[in-house]
């Protein structure tokens, strides 16, 4: 699925140099000439989330973020400007980039039984005490449906 919030990523097999057997894979997350990102990243980081745990929800007032689950499986929950929720599953085995524009609140839940790792590319580097991120709540959202996945 590719749309304004999701871009499917290219995953290529890698081969052993001696006999050409498949020895892994390479996932292309960002190339300058792909034009996936409107602004080049100013900050890149990896964060982990424990099994069954929720990160967020929060809102970035100045920054657009792009997320890729590089280990495990998570669901991103975005609250669009019309108040409707969008749920996007991101899995390291089927990589996709989730785009969260500034002022769109989001959270993510680890759906795997192990720690999941999310790589973030942001168009604005965070600075301590810049008050750019606001914690909020999704009071009308049913978080319990994701607890069954674990």
Predicted regions and their residues:
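Asparagine-centered strand-capping/turn motif at beta-strand->loop junctions
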Residues: 109-111
């Amino acid at each position: 699925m590719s749309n304004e919030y999701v871009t499917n990523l290219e995953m290529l097999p890698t081969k052993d140099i001696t006999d050409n057997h498949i020895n892994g894979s390479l996932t292309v997350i960002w190339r300058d000439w792909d034009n996936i990102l409107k602004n080049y990243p100013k900050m890149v980081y990896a964060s982990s989330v424990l099994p069954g745990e929720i990160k967020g929800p929060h809102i970035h007032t100045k920054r657009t973020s792009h997320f890729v689950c590089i280990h495990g499986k998570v669901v991103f929950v975005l609250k669009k400007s019309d108040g409707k929720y969008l749920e996007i599953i991101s899995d390291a085995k089927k990589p996709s980039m989730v785009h969260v524009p500034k002022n769109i609140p989001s959270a993510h839940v680890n759906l795997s039984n192990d720690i999941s790792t999310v790589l973030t590319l942001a168009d604005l580097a965070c600075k301590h005490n810049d008050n750019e991120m606001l914690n909020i709540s999704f009071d009308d959202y049913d978080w319990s449906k994701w607890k069954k996945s674990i």
